[in-house]
Amino acid sequence: MILTTARLNCRPVTVPRLFNRSFSQSFIILKKKSSTPTEKVEEDEIDVNELLKKAETQFKKTLEIQKQKMNEIKQGNFNPKVFNSLVFKNNRKFTDIATTSLKGKNALLITVFDPKDVKTVISGVLAANLNLTPERVPNNDLQLKVSLPPPTTESRLKVAKDLKRVFEEYKQSSLKDSLGTIRGSILKEFKSFKKDDAVRKAERDLEKLHKDYVNKLHDQFQKVEKSIVK
């Protein structure tokens, strides 16, 4: 009887069933907790890659802006926009009363919109100290011819100096389009992410990208400089 009672007392034991329920609940909790960091890492990787694309887009834009600026400087007085920044009496802009075009290889042609403004344009160009003299075109009351002097060694050196200044500005300065400013802005955005392997790699990739575009910017400058100082 004692043996029988022992056996009967052992039957109601439900430890296995309680153990299974507890294990199942623990597994679900762990699964939820482990999935959240993974999703966050994937989101971070997507975000930092987007920032790298953003940086390269802005770097390319800087390269194009410098190219445009250097071409304008290279043209010097041969640039039809040479008078566009002039402002006359009563705050009237040159572009409001006249326009300029190239005339052959060694001259500019100013076309004034109103005959009454011809004298204003002539005196304004002379006062700008550009070493350029507008002359009336015979039988045309609206046009002025500006003969362009051939470039000298001094003028070439000045152009080269201006080109170097533009290069330095777009490499590293407070300009919003300078490579240095763009790099600093992207690095600041990286700080909003947790410092994991993906972010560290993105920072290294940014530094490499920045260095590549500094070299491209410098190559662009040297190419234009060589065409000036021969």
Curated annotation (Swiss-Prot):
<keyword id="KW-0496">Mitochondrion</keyword>
<feature type="transit peptide" description="Mitochondrion">
    <location>
        <begin position="1"/>
        <end position="24"/>
    </location>
</feature>
<comment type="similarity">
    <text>Belongs to the RRF family.</text>
</comment>
<dbReference type="GO" id="GO:0006412">
    <property type="term" value="P:translation"/>
</dbReference>
<protein>
    <recommendedName>
        <fullName>Ribosome-recycling factor, mitochondrial</fullName>
    </recommendedName>
</protein>
<dbReference type="InterPro" id="IPR036191">
    <property type="entry name" value="RRF_sf"/>
</dbReference>
<keyword id="KW-0648">Protein biosynthesis</keyword>
<dbReference type="Pfam" id="PF01765">
    <property type="entry name" value="RRF"/>
</dbReference>
<keyword id="KW-0809">Transit peptide</keyword>
<dbReference type="InterPro" id="IPR002661">
    <property type="entry name" value="Ribosome_recyc_fac"/>
</dbReference>
<comment type="function">
    <text>Necessary for protein synthesis in mitochondria. Functions as a ribosome recycling factor in mitochondria.</text>
</comment>
<dbReference type="GO" id="GO:0043023">
    <property type="term" value="F:ribosomal large subunit binding"/>
</dbReference>
<dbReference type="GO" id="GO:0032543">
    <property type="term" value="P:mitochondrial translation"/>
</dbReference>
<dbReference type="GO" id="GO:0005739">
    <property type="term" value="C:mitochondrion"/>
</dbReference>
<dbReference type="InterPro" id="IPR023584">
    <property type="entry name" value="Ribosome_recyc_fac_dom"/>
</dbReference>
<dbReference type="GO" id="GO:0003747">
    <property type="term" value="F:translation release factor activity"/>
</dbReference>
